From Swiss-Prot:
Protein name according to UniProt: Ribonuclease H
Protein EC: 3.1.26.4
Family: Belongs to the RNase H family.
Gene Ontology molecular function terms on file: magnesium ion binding; nucleic acid binding; RNA-DNA hybrid ribonuclease activity
Reaction it catalyzes: Endonucleolytic cleavage to 5'-phosphomonoester
Domain RNase H type-1: 4-146
Designated gene of the protein: rnhA
Length: 153
């Protein structure tokens, strides 16, 4: 990016039918007015894993280091970065304060890795409200679940 003030906006969401159950994730990337939608499916997963997967895949879609505003309705995802949970988990060898292992370590570690090249603002949005792109992500993630359930009854 030539102009360091240019920001990529990434909206993410995950959905799960049952928890655990079949799940979908989606991300919408917006840069200079151009919108890219990506989404995917996992057979047996949880809503939190899908929220993390959406952020991972959104960041993996970037072709070079960027300034990013990443929007999610997942407190689990946003608070891990904004409240310093992730640093504490790393310092404590991926154990929570109650000494139990952090869930979804594989995805947290992958998310940290794909985050490294970027400057990211982690922004919480209200789910199922009037945020156009959060609602679009929710729809795309849910469509992934419906599509796979229909194809594999």
């Amino acid at each position: 990016m030539k102009n360091n003030n240019e920001i990529v906006e990434i909206y993410t969401d995950g959905a799960c039918s049952g928890n655990p159950g079949p799940g979908g994730w989606a991300a919408v990337l917006i840069y200079k007015g151009i919108k890219k939608e990506i989404s995917g499916f996992e057979e047996n997963t949880t809503n939190n894993r899908m929220e993390l997967k959406a952020a991972i895949e959104g960041l993996k879609a970037l072709k070079r280091p960027c300034k990013v505003n990443l929007y999610s309705d997942s407190s689990y995802l946003i608070n891990a970065f904004n409240e310093g949970w992730i640093e504490k988990w790393q310092k404590n060898n991926w154990l929570k304060s109650d000494k139990t292992p952090v869930e979804n370590q594989d995805l947290w570690k992958e998310l940290l890795e794909v985050s490294k090249p970027h400057q990211i603002n982690w922004i919480k949005v209200k789910g199922h409200s009037d945020n156009e792109y959060n609602n679009l992500c929710d729809r795309l993630a849910t469509e992934q679940i419906k599509k796979h359930i229909k194809e594999n009854p």
